């Protein structure tokens, strides 16, 4: 269950303001979450795949930074 163009368009349509809204933080977080779930599932069966484990750490870090940005942005708007 990998991220192909149809699934990517569906995620963007569900979380974005329009179907072309790929830069929105919420859309980026949703796409990263989908990738993280797939990689986590892959690592359950391939425990010694250390390169994929490292890429998972990078994706989790990116998502964490985006979540922190959204939290900071929402607090300043209030």
Swiss-Prot record:
Keywords: Ribonucleoprotein, Ribosomal protein, RNA-binding, rRNA-binding. One of its GO terms (cellular component) is cytosolic small ribosomal subunit. It comes from the Bacteria. The keyword Ribonucleoprotein applies. GO terms for biological process: translation. One of its GO terms (molecular function) is structural constituent of ribosome. Belongs to the universal ribosomal protein uS15 family. HAMAP family: Ribosomal_uS15_B. Part of the 30S ribosomal subunit. Forms a bridge to the 50S subunit in the 70S ribosome, contacting the 23S rRNA. One of the primary rRNA binding proteins, it binds directly to 16S rRNA where it helps nucleate assembly of the platform of the 30S subunit by binding and bridging several RNA helices of the 16S rRNA. This is Small ribosomal subunit protein uS15. It comes from Karelsulcia muelleri (strain GWSS). The gene is rpsO.
